[in-house]
């Protein structure tokens, strides 16, 4: 039978047998469709963690914390599988809510929403939460802001202070915000006002507090991370504001005269499609045209529900990196020229 360059690698059907998650992922590298893409994302992420002088940035959108993903993200932070987190404010509000002992509840997307409203229950697809508890948390944020006083700070600085406050209150160690505080992983929230944290800060503002979250300082600080890193890789859960906030750093650095190659690893888990023209489904090949991602970067886009992908990928990485020491970046924000980065084992 005639063969050519296109038919050198046959697919291998998956056997059902006893094996680890990482072994299953390795086996799926020779399958097809999004199963193979999921396996390729594990391979790319694992390889990225082996690279020297590399900073890994994660963009986190969607209601991942109410859906039960907070311990996955906090694990990735503690194990330094990510070095910087850009998130929606909602995820971090929900994380703080749970860190202080509150809960989200298993619900149903078929519930009667009018009845839920009458009982003070909020619905996030098939997850429930208690509105009164959310409002208590809003006021807790307002009280905390008043304790900070009248300052102007980046969202990174604010989230650091919030992490410190959660630790003081005895918050759970599996919190995203607490883990980031303890492990010196910066968190940026470029749309902080679009969340219950923003609601809490608005309450404080109405009480007379003049606390400003400097979002342009956010842009400057995260761009410094990219400028001063040896190499950068990105992992996007969904898209939206967190994705573009990270993507635009390469463009900003270039405009400011820095020689940046674009992100050298790029992974995304998304349920959006590219043909609608939105950023959440935008391909990494399109990002190459902007200079956001290097042309020769390892690019893996997986079209999948992130609540399916994240637990599988995290378990596979846990198995693949066991006993491996990574050279993770250490950030110092008080240097004479702003941010300083050292890569330490």
Curated annotation (Swiss-Prot):
Cofactor(s) for this UniProt protein: NAD(+)
Record bears the keyword Transferase: yes
Enzyme class: transferase
Signal sequence, renumbered to the chain: none
Residue stretches in coiled coil: none
The gene coding this protein: dys2
Protein name stated in the entry: Probable deoxyhypusine synthase 2
EC number(s) reported in the record: 2.5.1.46
HAMAP family: DHS (MF_00153)
Catalytic activity: [eIF5A protein]-L-lysine + spermidine = [eIF5A protein]-deoxyhypusine + propane-1,3-diamine
Family: Belongs to the deoxyhypusine synthase family.
A molecular function (GO) term: deoxyhypusine synthase activity
SUPFAM superfamilies membership: DHS-like NAD/FAD-binding domain
Pfam family, one: DS
Swiss-Prot/TrEMBL keywords: Hypusine biosynthesis, NAD, Transferase
Active site residues of this protein: 292
Highest taxon in the source lineage: Archaea
GO CC term (a single one): cytoplasm
Pathway assigned to this chain's UniProt record: Protein modification; eIF5A hypusination
InterPro entries: Deoxyhypus_synthase_arc, Deoxyhypusine_synthase, Deoxyhypusine_synthase_sf, DHS-like_NAD/FAD-binding_dom
Described purpose of this protein according to its UniProt entry: Catalyzes the NAD-dependent oxidative cleavage of spermidine and the subsequent transfer of the butylamine moiety of spermidine to the epsilon-amino group of a specific lysine residue of the eIF-5A precursor protein to form the intermediate deoxyhypusine residue.
